[in-house]
UniProtKB/Swiss-Prot annotation:
Stretches for region Disordered: 188-213
Entry keyword annotation includes Cell cycle: no
Protein name: Mediator of RNA polymerase II transcription subunit 7
Sites of the Glycyl lysine isopeptide (Lys-Gly) (interchain with G-Cter in SUMO2) crosslink: 185
GO terms assigned for molecular function: transcription coregulator activity
Gene field: MED7
Subunit text: Component of the Mediator complex, which is composed of MED1, MED4, MED6, MED7, MED8, MED9, MED10, MED11, MED12, MED13, MED13L, MED14, MED15, MED16, MED17, MED18, MED19, MED20, MED21, MED22, MED23, MED24, MED25, MED26, MED27, MED29, MED30, MED31, CCNC, CDK8 and CDC2L6/CDK11. The MED12, MED13, CCNC and CDK8 subunits form a distinct module termed the CDK8 module. Mediator containing the CDK8 module is less active than Mediator lacking this module in supporting transcriptional activation.
Post-translational modification Phosphoserine, affected residues: 194
Compartment list: Nucleus
BP GO annotations: regulation of transcription by RNA polymerase II; somatic stem cell population maintenance
GO CC terms in record: core mediator complex; mediator complex; nuclear body
Protein's UniProt keywords contain Hydrolase: no
Coiled coil: none
């Protein structure tokens, strides 16, 4: 017979899959798909488990004697188990001193093992509560971060509105309104010979170009103010 196979505490590294999940394969959709969900049973740490098993199995289903009642206080039972472990450990030391080869040594070791199993079982029964508390804390942190982000956004928005109002207040009063600049004046096509093909004279084009230059300068000044605001901490 061959030697029993050693079961590793950790799964082996999936080196055969690393080369398949390159950036190019992922972009082109050539990366292997994830395995389908397990429906029946699976192996973990050398043991077989069923998918419909309870997360925390009762002690009786594992063939372990129950030392505490069905209805109990976890804190009190953990304190009692902790004290029992200490007393049994002292008894074990006494046995090792007086009669190391006695059969009571094995019995005391089994008692300690049973007590530790119960301690771990009671601690594991707190795992669902711990998961709920962890989820609650995580959601509270996310909520606080979103509120802080919204508050910072509101402050930046108020600063932008204030700067725009200051810029508007600094504009000259004789600056033409945007509506007047956007409005297109309909003129007959039979203009005199001094006008060009669009019905505008050279003087009108010069005036409109001058106004356009003034508006561009104001826009550039506003952009500089906004850039300075973004650079501030």
């Amino acid at each position: 017979m061959g030697e029993p196979q050693q079961v590793s505490a950790l799964p082996p590294p999936p080196m055969q899959y690393i080369k398949e999940y390159t950036d190019e394969n992922i972009q082109e959709g050539l990366a292997p798909k994830p395995p389908p969900p397990i429906k029946d049973s699976y192996m973990m740490f050398g043991n077989q488990f069923q998918c419909d098993d309870l997360i925390i199995r009762p002690l009786e289903s594992q063939g372990i004697e129950r030392l505490h009642p069905m209805q109990f206080d976890h804190k009190k039972e953990l304190r009692k188990l902790n004290m029992s472990i200490l007393i049994n450990f002292l008894d074990l030391l006494d046995i090792l001193i007086r009669s190391p080869g006695s059969i009571k040594r094995e019995e005391k070791l089994e008692d300690l093992k049973l007590l530790f199993v119960h301690v771990h079982h009671l601690i594991n029964e707190y795992r669902p509560h711990q998961a709920r508390e962890t989820l609650r804390v995580m959601m509270e942190v996310q909520k606080r971060q979103r509120l802080e982000t919204a508050e910072r956004f509101q402050k930046h928005l108020e600063r932008v509105i204030e700067m725009i109002q200051n810029c508007l207040a600094s504009l000259p009063d004789d600056l033409p309104h945007s509506e007047a600049g956007m409005r297109v004046k309909a003129e007959p096509m039979d203009a005199d010979d001094s006008n060009n093909c669009t019905g505008q004279s050279d003087q009108q084009r010069e005036n409109s170009g001058h106004r356009r230059d003034q508006i561009i300068e104001k826009d550039a000044a506003l952009c500089v103010l906004i850039d300075e605001m973004n650079e501030r901490p």
